[in-house]
Amino acid sequence: MKAIFVLNAAPKDNTWYAGGKLGWSQYHDTGFYGNGFQNNNGPTRNDQLGAGAFGGYQVNPYLGFEMGYDWLGRMAYKGSVDNGAFKAQGVQLTAKLGYPITDDLDIYTRLGGMVWRADSKGNYASTGVSRSEHDTGVSPVFAGGVEWAVTRDIATRLEYQWVNNIGDAGTVGTRPDNGMLSLGVSYRFGQEDAAPVVAPAPAPAPEVATKHFTLKSDVLFNFNKATLKPEGQQALDQLYTQLSNMDPKDGSAVVLGYTDRIGSEAYNQQLSEKRAQSVVDYLVAKGIPAGKISARGMGESNPVTGNTCDNVKARAALIDCLAPDRRVEIEVKGYKEVVTQPQA
């Protein structure tokens, strides 16, 4: 079966991500008007390269928190007589609110604040004065953009960010705003899919275990008798050991007594029942639970000799020929537990 991955623009809940961005940064309201700074006599280069790095924590598909560093660029005040420069950078903390448009594309906004540092300098040949000052402060940050999941772990974003009132004109001579359009890439940690929970294989059905034992009646009993002989007791002792070793779950045993066809059918039926019961009584006395074993007389049914003795007329010879029909069969049936080895 092939694995199917669904990309999501937002990272998984309760995971971290980190990335960087690069873009076009532009200052607005850039004139010098305070603390001895004065306007230049040439063009002002108010757009520069901006860059940043950020890290975040995704709470759920709609909410995350980000912290980042931004270099907002250096603005040059050009002039052949009077010139100067202004630059700013800062650390920001924002809440990121997102909403999915498709499975792999989100729109989002970020709202928060930036702790910034602003530096300015001026060289004024017209007055023979040079100035250099810096200032720090906090300004609100607003940003909006779209984020696209390239892979499960990698996402890109296109964003426009606005920082209001950077610097104090009374200190650094100006108080510009900054807008930055950037393209960012982030790596999301912990996006691996959890291992699927494999349901354990159902326990195999127990196997039915059946075993047959056949004992010659001539070993167990004297001819035409139902009392066990000493040799018969020894044979049953050996049988008991085998039955004890089997130990099938929910096992039971049926003792079937058979006779030959000599004598009346009714007599043979009665004799087979007595012989079967004698075997049961002996095995119960040895320790087999009485509820687990039963006796059944089968009379002269199911002969194993077939018609092989049909032409035997002498009684003694017929008794010998029909000896295989005189038997006791024990059928043990139960359930055997099937043990499967766990797969590595």
Curated annotation (Swiss-Prot):
Extracellular side: 25-49, 72-89, 115-139, 163-179
GO-annotated cellular components: cell outer membrane; pore complex
Keyword line: Cell outer membrane, Conjugation, Disulfide bond, Ion transport, Membrane, Porin, Repeat, Signal, Transmembrane, Transmembrane beta strand, Transport
Xref: InterPro entries: Bact_OuterMem_StrucFunc, OMP/PagP_b-brl, OMP_bac, OmpA, OmpA-like, OMPA-like_CS, OmpA-like_sf, OmpA-like_TM_dom
Localization terms from the record: Cell outer membrane
Pfam assignment, any one: OmpA
Record PROSITE patterns: OMPA_1, OMPA_2
Sequence repeat residues: 199-200, 201-202, 203-204, 205-206
Residues under site feature: Part of salt bridge gating mechanism: 66, 157
Disulfide bridge partners, by residue number: 309-321
Ranges where the record places region 4 X 2 AA tandem repeats of A-P: 199-206
GO BP annotations listed: monoatomic ion transmembrane transport; symbiont-mediated suppression of host toll-like receptor signaling pathway
Membrane disposition: Multi-pass membrane protein
GO MF annotations, alphabetized: porin activity
OmpA-like domain ranges (all copies): 208-336
Transmembrane segments: 15-24, 50-59, 63-71, 90-100, 105-114, 140-149, 154-162, 180-188
Residue intervals annotated with topology Periplasmic: 1-14, 60-62, 101-104, 150-153, 189-344
Entry note about domains: The extracellular loops are most variable in sequence, and in some bacteria confer sensitivity to phage and/or colicins.
PANTHER family: LIPOPROTEIN YIAD-RELATED (PTHR30329:SF21), STATOR ELEMENT OF FLAGELLAR MOTOR COMPLEX (PTHR30329)
Family to which this protein belongs: Belongs to the outer membrane OOP (TC 1.B.6) superfamily. OmpA family.
HAMAP family on file: OmpA
Function: With TolR probably plays a role in maintaining the position of the peptidoglycan cell wall in the periplasm. Acts as a porin with low permeability that allows slow penetration of small solutes; an internal gate slows down solute passage. Required for conjugation with F-type plasmids; probably serves as the mating receptor on recipient cells.
Subunit structure: Monomer and homodimer.
Protein name per the record: Outer membrane protein A
Source taxonomy: Bacteria, Pseudomonadati, Pseudomonadota, Gammaproteobacteria, Enterobacterales
